[in-house]
Amino acid sequence: MKLNVSKKGIRVLGISESFRKGVSKKSVLAGIVMRGDLLIDGFAITTITVGGLDATQGVLNIYAMLNRKDINAIMLNGVIIAWYNVIDLEKIYNETKVPIIAVTYEESEEKLDKYFKENFPKDYEKRIEIYRRNGEREKIQLKTGHTVLVRYLGMRRDEAKGLLNKFIRQGAIPEPLRVSRLLARSLMKHLQLSSQCSK
């Protein structure tokens, strides 16, 4: 699918997650469809396993649940979520044929190979393989003056920058990711409260 950033009716599926480390066994994954004029016209929710290897399928499930043919790009809050549950960008792009971009906001100081091996001795090689396949991050300076680090497939660098700038209003977080993160956090709090009330 060709990405036309200047398209008036462009729609982005922004996906974020929320969990409590050491408490949650599941992480809430929330996806919202946002138009170029920042109106929201769809959302979907699922869960993935904290420390699991099902984040990629979680993203695909969100996309499938929406059953939309008008999504022009998928935007993710990073590729490592829910405590080292690694998203496979290539698999998502190959299965959806929709351009995809993953956004992070800080340089990583972590030695990921070491953490994968220490915490997941049974499948650390798989996690490392997926992570490396995602490639290196690129720095992009936004119109707000903030810099983000991105990985992308199905789009050029100038298209990635144009897409981010179209959906940014302030700071460094694009609106589809800001809103989907708020939704995921609210749902996680609701689930925790419901669990406490049922005890």
Predicted segments, located by residue:
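Gly/Ser/Thr-rich loops at beta-strand to alpha-helix junctions
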Residues: 18-22, 78-87, 105-110, 155-157
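Charge-patterned, long linear interaction tracts outside catalytic cores
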Residues: 152-199
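Long, charge-dense
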Residues: 88-148
